Amino acid sequence: MYKRQGLAYISNGALVVDVAKPEDTKEVPPCIILKSDGASLYQTTDLATIVEREKLFKPNRIIYVVDKRQEMHFTQVFRVSRLAELVPEDTKLQFLGFGTMNGKDGKPFKTRQGGVMRLEHLIRDINDAVYDKIMASRDEDEETARENAKIIGLSAIKYGDLSNQASKDYVFDVDRFTSFEGNTGPYILYTIVRIKSILKKFGQEIPTAITVPDGAAQKALMLDMTRFSDVFAQASAEYAPHKLCAYIYDLANDFNRFYHETKILAEEDQDKKNGYIALISYCKDILETCIELLGFSAPEKM
């Protein structure tokens, strides 16, 4: 097909397509479609996959989330796709490169034996670390602790990964990622569970009316809650889940500051108390919506 279109030619026995543009700031080599022995390459199969996806799904956008070191490869593939008109002009082909997960030594994360860490083993190690922390600090039966460790462990992994800008390398530190303090998944879950506990103790139908703030902490929490729609829209448009993570970390901090400065359940003014309860209930809804978008959930208690 590429030869019929006059795009491909033989160079040193291989079938190639020139994809360089005058405005390129760095060299973009020709895209090799077939090797000199007729064997296909990743470029060949990726181009075939684009053809098949267009045929089956007619997508508006195709996004490749892969190692950032593959950027040149996909630059070549996308340019061949445009030249050969494999997809309509308005179909967006997008490369989203991610960095590497490194150990404390700054090198790619490995097992103690020096091999590549399997995901199942990573999950097991994280869950065990969380379980140990639960048993060391809380009076909880083993079965419940194990179940909670799975939920909290998943948050540690997903939040730890997604809270970093995708294209940047980051250090995977089990102790830091499983901490219940700081910018971590377990801290976010602990905040949600704290709100659930307050609402349960309130023991009545949750009010819906938020009152005028009577302090700086309450005002800060309310203002941060109003940012949700804008943050969500920006994170979605930019494929940037780390911005959603940064937002819920700020929101969790704002709630905890309000919690420590305010006697929520002990407030004698019923209207004020109802306003507090309505506010933290909405805060919980926002936090739970965000962690659902990030791919994890909160337990009922911690």
PLM features: residue spans?
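Non-catalytic interaction-recognition regions
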Residues: 3-302
